[in-house]
Amino acid sequence: MEIIESDVVIIGGGPAGCTCALYTSRSNLKTVILDKNPSVGALAITHQIANYPGVPVDISGEKLLTLMREQAVQYGTDYRRAQVFGIDASGEWKTVYTPEGTFKAKALVLASGAMGRPASFKGEADFLGKGVSYCATCDGAFYKNREVAVVGVNKEAIEEATVLTKFASTVHWITSSDPKSDNEEAMELMDNSNIKHWSRTRLLAVSYTHLTLPTMIGV
């Protein structure tokens, strides 16, 4: 099996990994990126980005990530498609094991992303980045004068729904239980004219045409 030595090995080819590689490569450090799949990850699956500084036109996440990767490679980064199955970081030289070869480096950077949460309803993975979003601050402007749904009764869901009321014509707030009456933020949200509250309800699925919202009985 091939053994490749370098100064830095970066696991993950997303924006964090590519940014790190750009800096290390420009510092004349021999750098290798090991990327399982350039088509997955939070940025790669994002359908449209309109708030990235320095990019004046809407761009897909996949295209933006390609530009980041190409810039790192331009300065000497060795980009490789590889699935990491083992790491030994106990010694001075860090060792990373893949089916394609063994990589040794004095520095190891883990930039494997944060897409570990499993889908919670049918269609979530299919529409992620194409209508399903986890960031109202990032994507709220896309939903101006449109109907949008927010699922959840926790603090984060309340904050996201509140942000979306500034853009959407109607925000369908879907909660599996009734908000606590002493939660001032929740009560203010329910008083908002743009909010339609679906209490004791859970989201089963999404499709191109509708949401499936069965009312939960006795929950």
Can you describe what each PLM-predicted range is?
Residues 69-90, 95-96, 102-103, 166-211:
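A Rossmann-like FAD-binding core segment of flavoenzymes
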Residues 53-69, 178-182:
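Short beta-strand to alpha-helix junction loop
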Residues 210-219:
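Single conserved hydrophobic/aromatic residue that forms the stacking wall/gate
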Residues 48-53, 151, 189-193:
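Short, hinge-like loop/turn segments at secondary-structure boundaries
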Residues 1-11, 27, 79-145:
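FAD-binding core/adjacent interface of flavoenzyme oxidoreductases
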Residues 37-60:
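Conserved N-terminal glycine-rich FAD pyrophosphate-binding loop of Rossmann-like flavoproteins
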Residues 4-5, 10-36, 128, 134-183:
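Rossmann-like dinucleotide/flavin-binding elements
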